Amino acid sequence: ALDFFIDKLGMKEVRRKEVPEGEFTLVFLAADDNESQLELTYNWNQNEPYSGGDNFGHVAYSVENIYDYCEKLEKKGVTILRPPRDGKMAFIRSPDQISIELLQQGPPLPIQEPWSSMKNQGKW
């Protein structure tokens, strides 16, 4: 999960807390020091993949240029499940199956290819 959120989405780790008595680690990530933080929990003895992933809805982030951001993610191996056909919104999933919405800051960008003809993939 850290590879996805840090290396692919560009977030940074701002704090980490080891909790030996509970056998878990909390990792706090943010897009910027002044931004809201995302808390990831690593359970030390979790041997099976987590199930679910959209039982709380989804996480949303705004980006400066949705086309550039989606292109960067594709180059890093992230599948764009709902392409930004409208110049405003896209969906991806984390390796733990968390649904992530990407939103264009401000008004939608002009519609452009290849995004406008791309189909949805899977569940988002």
Q: What are these regions, as identified by a protein language model?
A:
Residues 1-37:
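Core segments of cupin and vicinal oxygen chelate
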Residues 54-58:
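Eukaryotic phosphotyrosine signaling hubs
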Residues 20-22, 35, 47, 106-109:
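Flexible, glycine-rich phosphate/dinucleotide-binding loops
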